[in-house]
Swiss-Prot record:
Residues 303-345 are annotated as: Disordered. InterPro entries: Ribosomal_protein_uL10, Ribosomal_uL10, Ribosomal_uL10-like_insert, Ribosomal_uL10-like_insert_sf, Ribosomal_uL10-like_sf, Ribosomal_uL10_arc. The lineage of its organism: Archaea, Thermoproteota, Thermoprotei, Thermoproteales, Thermoproteaceae. Keywords: Ribonucleoprotein, Ribosomal protein, RNA-binding, rRNA-binding. Belongs to the universal ribosomal protein uL10 family. It comes from the Archaea. The keyword rRNA-binding applies. This is Large ribosomal subunit protein uL10. GO terms for biological process: cytoplasmic translation. Disulfide bonds: none annotated. One of its GO terms (cellular component) is cytosolic large ribosomal subunit. It comes from Pyrobaculum aerophilum (strain ATCC 51768 / DSM 7523 / JCM 9630 / CIP 104966 / NBRC 100827 / IM2). Residues 319-332 have a biased composition (Basic and acidic residues). Forms part of the ribosomal stalk, playing a central role in the interaction of the ribosome with GTP-bound translation factors. Pfam families: Ribosomal_L10, RL10P_insert.
């Protein structure tokens, strides 16, 4: 290693410690083998949690604790340099998890392998914490007063403290007090789930991706897929895309439109005949009503159809206007017919 200082050059004459050379060599091999390197926060992480994760994640990759400077040396050896965004993140108390698994899947795996630990003052209860009835390993002493402070009924039996009945000492979301933490430790309850605090992932040696960009909100994506499914179905119905689901909805609608069009054009078929007869009867009754009003000497009587609810009798003077409007109405144009037929196919 040479360091330029003005016109002088510093040349390292002493060899690097064998331990550091070995660490750099191992890191180099891991970087060559695994495309993804997760960084996780070591601050406040107990050795028990770290060793437990090493054991649980051994099928998915390798957890290594490497000094940032040594990791950067190994990274430069493998990739020929280190991007500024990666160099900025590789500093302080960080650990490394080398893996070939999809980063989004790794986040899920880490969460599923959370490690239980004893509660500490300031922790939040993840659920209602219940101290079960039965014996404890604690001998009578000052600890009994702390049981009493938490309103846990106790008795002394066989030289040990016994819990008289199941007692809730902390509700979900409640902050753990020093008394709660000590009592839970005495009775052997570890209510807190701790996991590696992932910071992000080095993506194939090219860039650093923050953990917030990798967390997938399952419910959000479920809603997006459901919305997309509704839009896709509506589009398929509008363009009459021939699938089983679309045809099951389109064919009955097309049949109804075809029958309505045939009835409007006066085409006689088994389906249109009831509608044509009803329309003919209605038109005949309307015409008879007009004639009866203008020529009462003919003795024409018109029987109007009975309805479920009484309605006002239409004024005779309005019938000629309606008849006149009916006569002025023309049949559908060729463009309307063509448009209706096109909508069916």
């Amino acid at each position: 290693m040479m360091l330029a200082i003005g016109k002088r050059r510093y040349v390292r004459t002493r060899q690097y410690p064998a331990r550091k050379v070995k660490i750099v060599s191992e890191a180099t091999e891991l970087l060559q083998k695994y495309p993804y390197v997760f960084l996780f926060d070591l601050h406040g992480l107990s050795s028990r949690i770290l060793h437990e994760y090493r054991y649980r994640l051994r099928r998915y990759g390798v957890i290594k604790i490497i000094k940032p400077t040594l990791f950067k040396i190994a990274f430069t050896k493998v990739y020929g340099g280190i991007p500024a965004e990666i160099a900025e993140k590789v500093r302080g108390e960080v650990g490394f998890f080398f893996t070939s698994f999809n980063p989004a899947e790794v986040i899920k795996i880490v969460a599923e392998n959370s490690v239980r630990r004893a509660a500490q003052p300031g922790d939040k209860a993840p659920f209602d914490i219940v101290v079960p009835a039965g014996p404890t390993n604690a001998s009578p002493g000052p600890i009994i007063s702390k049981f009493g402070k938490l309103k846990i009924p106790t008795r002394v039996q066989e030289g040990k403290i016994w819990i008289a009945k199941d007692t809730v000492v902390a509700k979900a979301g409640q902050e753990i007090t020093p008394e709660m933490a000590e009592v839970l430790r005495v009775v052997g309850i570890e209510p807190i789930f701790e996991q590696l605090r992932l910071l992000g992932v080095i993506w194939r040696g090219q860039r650093f991706v923050d953990i917030s960009e990798l967390i997938i909100d399952v419910n959000k994506y479920k809603e997006l897929f459901e919305t997309a499914s509704v839009y896709a179905r509506n589009l398929a119905l509008n363009i009459v895309y021939p699938t089983r689901e679309v045809l099951q909805a389109v064919i009955p609608a097309a049949h109804m439109r075809a029958v309505a069009l045939a009835a409007k054009l006066g085409v006689v078929t088994r389906e249109t005949l009831p509608a044509l007869l009803s329309r003919a009867v209605a038109e005949a009754n309307a015409l008879a009503a007009v004639v009866a009003a203008k020529a009462p000497d003919l003795g024409i009587s018109v029987s109007l159809p009975q309805t479920a609810a009484p309605q006002q009798t239409p004024q005779p003077t309005e019938a000629p206007k309606e008849e006149a409007q009916e006569e002025k109405k023309e049949g559908p144009s060729e463009e309307e017919i063509a448009g209706s037929l096109a909508s069916l196919f």
